[in-house]
UniProtKB/Swiss-Prot annotation:
GO terms for molecular function: FAD binding; xanthine dehydrogenase activity. One of its GO terms (biological process) is hypoxanthine catabolic process. The keyword Transcription does not apply. Induction: Expression is very low in excess nitrogen (glutamate plus ammonia) and is induced during limiting-nitrogen conditions (glutamate). Expression decreases when allantoin is added during limiting-nitrogen conditions. Oxidizes hypoxanthine and xanthine to uric acid. It holds the Pfam family FAD_binding_5. The gene is pucC. Residues 7-176 form the FAD-binding PCMH-type domain. This is Probable xanthine dehydrogenase subunit C. It comes from the Bacteria. Its EC number is 1.17.1.4. It comes from Bacillus subtilis (strain 168).
């Protein structure tokens, strides 16, 4: 961490609102030199990379309505302040949505999971959970002067909600359906994933696929889904579609081509296991 970042961190003004309306008012009032935080693990990573901190930090940790886990016959509701470790261990989640608790074991190192929150993972728009949540059809409850419920995919793509606070995620239960999740590379490092891929085989015979990595916003792989659902699909053609569609970029550690190949290989293995030609 360079000296400029260290000095800026020492001058951060911390705000601790107790309610959503208070937190949102602070974010509006102090913009653009402000950010919201809960576990702050992403901020730590950004600072370590040399990104200068904002002058104001609004902690969401005192907002009780962002806590709590509940289940119904159809959905699991998880408060935004729930830690990734709690997502991994909570008995309600393990019983109702085991694929989600299993995925939590693959996200980051244990020390990070104890601090990082599901709300922060989603709010970053580059979180490792997002591909899985996309294929599960998750919805968010966000606060932007009022509580708004909307699909995760819409929130990721619409600029209208860029200042909204992610208060809760609502996840449909996927009972009787096979779901897969793979995080590739650098699991135990304090860095993001090299690639993340997720899929869900629905009871109606359709499929959902999504992928992403630490530097880009994950998205559904709609062309690849359509290829797989076409009668007599060809594995070679589907592989080429995956390589073309995977939304990956290069960084100093890894090329986009390597990421694409690694993710396409694990996705193809799952598709072939489900019923390849």
């Amino acid at each position: 961490m360079n000296g400029q970042v260290t000095k800026a961190r020492m001058n951060i003004q911390l705000w601790r609102p107790a309610a959503l309306d208070e937190a949102y008012s602070l974010l509006e009032k102090l913009a653009p030199d402000v950010c919201a935080a809960s576990g702050s693990t992403l901020l730590q990573l950004q600072w370590d990379k040399g990104t200068l901190p904002k002058q104001h930090l609004v902690s969401l940790e005192g907002i009780d309505e962002m806590r709590g886990i509940s289940t119904s016959d159809t959905h699991v509701s998880i408060g935004g302040l729930t830690s990734l470790n709690e997502c991994r261990k909570n008995p309600l989640i393990k019983r109702a949505l085991s694929c989600f608790s299993d995925a939590a074991s693959a996200v980051a190192a244990p020390g990070i999971r104890s601090r990082a929150t599901i709300g922060g993972n989603i709010a970053s728009k580059i979180g490792d959970f997002i591909p899985l949540l996309l294929v599960l059809g998750a919805e968010l409850i966000v606060y932007q002067k009022e509580l708004i419920r909307l699909p995760l995919g819409a929130w990721l793509s619409e600029e209208d909600f860029r200042t909204a606070i992610v208060t809760r995620v609502i996840i449909p239960r996927a009972e009787g359906e096979r779901v897969f999740y793979h995080k590739l590379g650098r699991r135990q490092a304090f860095t993001g994933a090299a690639a993340v891929a997720a899929g869900r085989f629905l009871k109606d015979g359709s499929i959902r696929l999504a992928a992403g990595h630490a530097d880009i916003t994950p998205r559904r792989l709609l062309d690849s889904e359509a290829k797989w659902m076409a009668p007599g699909w060809d594995p070679h053609e589907l592989y080429k579609t995956l390589i073309h569609e995977l939304p990956f970029s290069s960084d100093v550690f890894m090329s986009a081509a390597y990421r694409k190949k690694a993710a396409a290989n694990v996705i193809m293995a799952e598709l072939m296991a489900e019923g390849g030609e």
